[in-house]
């Protein structure tokens, strides 16, 4: 690597809106504010919503199920 051409790679803190602070390294060299992190994201916390699309799937199978049927 060439000397003095790469940006500074320093330790920074990323602060989430939930208050969680993550220490990481970046070339940005200033604190980052996050909207969501692994502590508050619904996928990681297990509080995700399941959308009920069963009616749409059944309707699709009724209309187009004939085309996918094997002979």
Curated annotation (Swiss-Prot):
GO terms for cellular component: ribonucleoprotein complex; ribosome. Zn(2+) binds at residues 16, 18, 37, 40. The keyword rRNA-binding applies. One of its GO terms (biological process) is translation. Its cofactor is Zn(2+). It comes from the Bacteria. The keyword rRNA-binding applies. One of its GO terms (molecular function) is metal ion binding. Keywords: Metal-binding, Ribonucleoprotein, Ribosomal protein, RNA-binding, rRNA-binding, Zinc. Binds 1 zinc ion per subunit. Binds the 23S rRNA. PANTHER family: 50S RIBOSOMAL PROTEIN L31, CHLOROPLASTIC, LARGE RIBOSOMAL SUBUNIT PROTEIN BL31A. HAMAP family: Ribosomal_bL31_1. Part of the 50S ribosomal subunit. Belongs to the bacterial ribosomal protein bL31 family. Type A subfamily. This is Large ribosomal subunit protein bL31. The lineage of its organism: Bacteria, Pseudomonadati, Pseudomonadota, Gammaproteobacteria, Pseudomonadales. The gene is rpmE.
